């Protein structure tokens, strides 16, 4: 029978993801902190933090796991036509803090957000250290969509996305896919399946299979040019 682990502020090791609870699905550990070293260790082993503002830090590794293989993100004919008509432009790593703030805004019918101030501060530090990255969608000078996540070797671990204009988050996802293909990334970790991710082409895989893929690609050296702040054209 699997049991929950409790982390302190000194102990960096995580239990094996195989020990995660089945109810709630994937809950592995409680406690610890959000220092860069602990966060990087978590993602390296297929674990991520996810908790509400009033909760302790909760660490997860769900089964199944939602993933994209770069090149398999869906784009319908209607979406392609729609995006071609938009005067939007795209950047990489130009506005990480603003993207996180956009993602942190509560969705409709949601009272709060899991992207707390504590989470934002922790991931800004990861960004400053070259581990966390953002994709931005602009309409003129206005940020209308984007996403952020972490790069672990040739794996991109997506965290959240947002939009302020219709389909802007989908455009950010397509831009991310294009960029990751160009930079020879092999896997996108989307964490937990939901209808929006499924509509974009995410696939559920068993946790053991995800860990196998992660292990295969996490130690590979990424293209050093991958996350230089840049303007990028979305090719449709």
Swiss-Prot record:
Pfam families xrefs: Leu_Phe_trans (PF03588)
GO BP annotations, alphabetical order: protein catabolic process
One term of GO molecular function: leucyl-tRNA--protein transferase activity
Catalytic activity entry: N-terminal L-lysyl-[protein] + L-leucyl-tRNA(Leu) = N-terminal L-leucyl-L-lysyl-[protein] + tRNA(Leu) + H(+); N-terminal L-arginyl-[protein] + L-leucyl-tRNA(Leu) = N-terminal L-leucyl-L-arginyl-[protein] + tRNA(Leu) + H(+); L-phenylalanyl-tRNA(Phe) + an N-terminal L-alpha-aminoacyl-[protein] = an N-terminal L-phenylalanyl-L-alpha-aminoacyl-[protein] + tRNA(Phe)
EC number: 2.3.2.6
Described function: Functions in the N-end rule pathway of protein degradation where it conjugates Leu, Phe and, less efficiently, Met from aminoacyl-tRNAs to the N-termini of proteins containing an N-terminal arginine or lysine.
Family note: Belongs to the L/F-transferase family.
Name of protein: Leucyl/phenylalanyl-tRNA--protein transferase
Species in which this protein is naturally found: Shewanella sp. (strain MR-7)
Gene name of the record: aat
